[in-house]
Amino acid sequence: MNKTPLLSVSPNLHELHICELLGNNANQNSRYSHIVKQYIAEVLQSSDDKIAATNTQPHLLTLGQLGFGDGHEIILLLAALQEANLQNPLIQQQTRIHISVFEQGPVNCKQLQHTWQQQGLLDSDHHLFDFTQALLNGEIAAIEGCQRLSLLQNQIIIDLYQGSPLAQAKTIATPNKQRITHWFALPHTNQEAHSDQYFHQRSVWEYGRLSVDNATFLAASTNDENIAPTIKKQLAFCGFLSSTSFKSTDDIAIAERNALRQQLQQQFAYNPLPPLHSNNNSPIAIIGGGIASASLALSLAERGKDVIIYCKDDTLGQGASGNKQGAIYPLLTPENGSLSQFFQQVFLYSRRRIQALVDDGYDIGHEWCGVLHTGFDQRSQTRLDKIIDGQAWPSEIAFAVSPHQATQLANVDIDKPGFYYPLGGWACPFEFAQASIAKAQTLTKVRIVYNSDISSLESHSSGWQLFSAEDNTPIATHEQVVIASGAQLTQYKQTKNLQITGFRGQVSHVPPQGELAQLNTVICANGYLTPQHNQLHCVGASYVKDPQHLDFCPIEQHENSLKMKQSFPNSNWPNDIDVSNNDARVGVRMVSRDHFPVMGCAPDVEALFTRYAVQQQSKDKPSLWQHYWQTTPAPIYDGLYVLGGLGSRGLSSGPLVAECLAANLCGELSPLSVELQALLSPNRMWLRKLLKGKALM
């Protein structure tokens, strides 16, 4: 029986001007333009059966691409999908496209803009302008790791992995269902200078691990010669089919792929990913009403999931997410380790999220005015200098500035050098949360239950019972519950042992006057200061551990007034900071010792300590127990998850961490590596010791 194509192929595909866009590559050999056209046609003709058999969500097509190059092939694919969409709307069919792209060399937005400008692709009347602009709006940076871009109303997700293809591919968690069905390799990837990076046997096996059993692999060449026989043999050996092959799949290769999946799962067995639940139509409950909750609701809604939010207040964003302005910029470290790389990824994604909502017409106060980071004493200056000198940072992430340059950027007198984050700025957190929910409600059923303070949760045969704080009666039962309640994250017996701490923060609101009113950028020194918005600057914030109350504090208000004076004692403009109106806002940030948020399955800490007690009484060698903890899933509460501990940078980290959790809950590819997810695990503080064979106490 003939199958209805997922996307109808346009009979006018040649009108995409493939040869024009591919330029010299196509001119050298018309074979290449034919191959690109063949690949696009194959993608568009993918059948519903192939997708449904390999993915949890209907109409989710997953592609892989080796090489990003100058982005031409991606632009063509976007254009082809859009053209097909006009004939057979993607939104009506709920079709989403996910493309994982691996690029060895660094690519950034400026390089792409320069190339496309020369080619006329950025002319507003060019037929591909919308697609090039969509990619440029993603502000691609030359950093290692995954950068997730959502395009065309999130119908197309591009995960761009930069760095060694092998190193990147091997860190991608194998989703429960979502696998790559089609691969396309750009010409430069199979040239002699690069082929070993892209087509090393270990790399190809990792591609196979991420793919369906009958995935096709099309490698393109721009010269008159065919693809090197060694590459063809490598692909065939690892079980890939050519796009025109009808031979059966290789059982040995399939077994090897499964072995690789099990190997990765065993390597990170201590950090179990959320299992897929049988009732995919059941709404997911979220406790909380801030950035974490709203971001998760939006990411779930984009995957067709219904959501019920329990908010203890009468409106969203009344906790730490209620500030008028929050700074957005990455946390960098001299060694650019996992924490630094994580914050570069999340910062860029948050910026994209906010901008996409603004472009959609949602009202979010924000300004991409950059962030200027300076020292405020000898110790902080030394620490900042180590960061500046520690790496050759991409200029789109940060660059050093002289006092003169800093003054020009800030438009107020800065008498010391600094580090400038050009893509940073500020945004209004509660407006961001409100916009995220409003957008989510246009996609699926997202219901908010206001004034609903959940006092406790109890495991039940049909899920988790939620009890109201008002009369301690059960108000609902849900199969899956995410606790994303900010400062209340540890109030439940299931989460009370999470190793995160609350810190009170009072942010002062000051009127613009004198030189202060001229401030053009966010300043981060001893505290932070934002440019004016709605006739107010924000300056702060205090940092008080385990606060006893959230009342206004005159002492903290006065201390906030001194932060910029202490940072820039030789400048006059800090004297314009007037906090005498006693206008301020107080919130609590939940912070972990290692500065990572917490995300994932809620840990059953009591069960973990019970196992540990057995270990203490055992006469087994410590190495045996160390192996046990390394290979055994840590105890968790099934169907219960946590999302929080965002600290003072929740505006930067919240959206991507929520996106990762949503992907995990839906069995989809995550934008964060398995290593980073392990570092976010709510269990990590205890397991960090147990995995090393150390005592917990």
Swiss-Prot record:
Record localization: Cytoplasm
Sequence segments annotated as region (FAD-dependent cmnm(5)s(2)U34 oxidoreductase): 287-697
Cofactor(s) demanded: FAD
Keywords: Cytoplasm, FAD, Flavoprotein, Methyltransferase, Multifunctional enzyme, Oxidoreductase, S-adenosyl-L-methionine, Transferase, tRNA processing
Region spans: tRNA (mnm(5)s(2)U34)-methyltransferase: 1-269
Any one GO MF annotation of this record: oxidoreductase activity, acting on the CH-NH group of donors
UniProt-listed Enzyme Commission number(s): 2.1.1.61, 1.5.-.-
Main location: cytoplasm
GO biological process: methylation; tRNA wobble uridine modification
GO cellular component: cytoplasm
Catalytic reactions of this protein: 5-aminomethyl-2-thiouridine(34) in tRNA + S-adenosyl-L-methionine = 5-methylaminomethyl-2-thiouridine(34) in tRNA + S-adenosyl-L-homocysteine + H(+)
Family designation: In the N-terminal section; belongs to the methyltransferase superfamily. tRNA (mnm(5)s(2)U34)-methyltransferase family.
Function: Catalyzes the last two steps in the biosynthesis of 5-methylaminomethyl-2-thiouridine (mnm(5)s(2)U) at the wobble position (U34) in tRNA. Catalyzes the FAD-dependent demodification of cmnm(5)s(2)U34 to nm(5)s(2)U34, followed by the transfer of a methyl group from S-adenosyl-L-methionine to nm(5)s(2)U34, to form mnm(5)s(2)U34.
HAMAP family in the record: MnmC (MF_01102)
Protein name as annotated: tRNA 5-methylaminomethyl-2-thiouridine biosynthesis bifunctional protein MnmC
UniProt source species: Shewanella frigidimarina (strain NCIMB 400)
